[in-house]
Amino acid sequence: MQLPEKKYIASFDIDAQNTFTPVCPDELPVAEGDTIAPELNAQAQFASLRLASRDAHSRCALWISDAEHAPLTPISGYPDLDIHWPAHAIIGTKGFDFIDGLDEAAYNYQVFKGIEADKHPYGACYHDLKDTLSTGAIEYLSCHGITTVICGGLATDYCVKNT
């Protein structure tokens, strides 16, 4: 595949956080998730802009599983929650942090998602499950003339896929 000029390309690192690695085994670990930093850094070399998204959750989130609500069981009554999850990516914890090898200062734009207790978005472009409340990522890319986005990250079945 022929890539356009670098000025039209952005690299988007999606949820490359410890919460999705064996570093945090009680959260949502992805096997070898802590080893992807070199590849994310390599793909960023093709781009003029680098973006990141991070889950940024509260300890009071309504979707956190517990003794009465097992992980992956449905939630009703909240339009921006679908299922229960183990606590993960809690702000101020090791799980919230980027995986080793990623430099927070290297990013031109960051999306923090899931801050509200009654929302658990998966993709990095919208704060809600109906894709109506923008995070600003699409607008940021558009105003910089970006036509191609190279995506990589963790939780490919939810977060990367929905981005």
What are these language model-derived features?
Residues 4-10:
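Extreme N-terminal starter segment of soluble prokaryotic enzymes
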Residues 10-12, 150:
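Conserved beta-strand elements of the Class I
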Residues 12-14, 54:
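Active-site flanking residues adjacent to catalytic metal/cofactor-binding acidic residues
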Residues 16-23:
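Short acidic, Gly/Ser-rich segments with clustered Asp/Glu that frequently serve as metal-coordination loops
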Residues 18, 55-57, 115, 155-158:
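Short, glycine/serine-rich, charged loops/turns that create anion-binding
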Residues 24-32, 124-128:
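Short glycine-enriched, charge-decorated loop/helix-capping segments at active-site entrances
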Residues 38-148:
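Active-site alpha/beta core segments
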Residues 146-162:
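Glycine-rich anion-binding loop/nest that anchors nucleotide
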